[in-house]
Regions:
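Tandem repeat scaffolds
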Residues: 1-169
Length: 169
């Protein structure tokens, strides 16, 4: 694959390894691709979608996710707290995000629908105006987390200490 820039591509049923990835993807669709354990360091994804992909244990240091959606993806153990925070915009639908970290990330207005978020680190994250629809937060950590106007009404298994978090309607 070209190692520089991919625009408006549909990439399907690909198993990635080593240096197979371009440095930047814009308006690309990844369908049923396997990125398990892949180093995505410093890659830019702009206005991209991932459908049915496996991103378990990917390394995302300085990776840019700008207007990126994930649907029906398996994303276990990914440390999103080290990705590039500039213009970070993520949407997750029907994904498994267990054991991920969003530590200290600014995710104002993030939308997460019908996802498993077990044992996820949200410590010191800014989740103002976030929408968590029908999500399972079993064992997830919220401490010094900004949850102003966040909607968790249809979600379950979360424990929020109002003394340790910012919670306002």
């Amino acid at each position: 694959m070209d190692n520089s820039f991919q625009l408006d591509q549909v990439i399907e049923n690909q198993t990635f390894s080593g240096n197979m990835l371009a440095k930047e993807y814009e308006a690309c669709e990844f369908n049923y691709c396997n990125f398990e354990g892949i180093d995505l360091v410093s890659i830019q994804f702009i206005n991209c979608s991932f459908m049915g992909c496996n991103l378990t244990n990917c390394k995302v240091k300085n990776t840019a996710f700008k207007e990126v959606s994930f649907t029906d993806c398996k994303i276990l153990g990914v440390n999103f707290s080290v990705c590039n925070p500039f213009l970070l915009e993520l949407v997750f639908t029907r994904c498994t995000l267990d054991l991920c970290s969003f530590y200290k990330l600014k995710l104002k207005g993030i939308v997460i629908n019908n996802c498993s978020l077990k044992n996820v680190d949200f410590v010191e994250a800014n989740l103002q105006d976030a929408v968590f629809e029908n999500c399972d937060f079993y064992g997830s950590a919220f401490e010094r987390t900004n949850l102003e106007r966040a909607d968790l009404t249809t979600s379950r298994n979360f424990s929020l200490d109002p003394e340790l978090n910012i919670i306002k309607k």
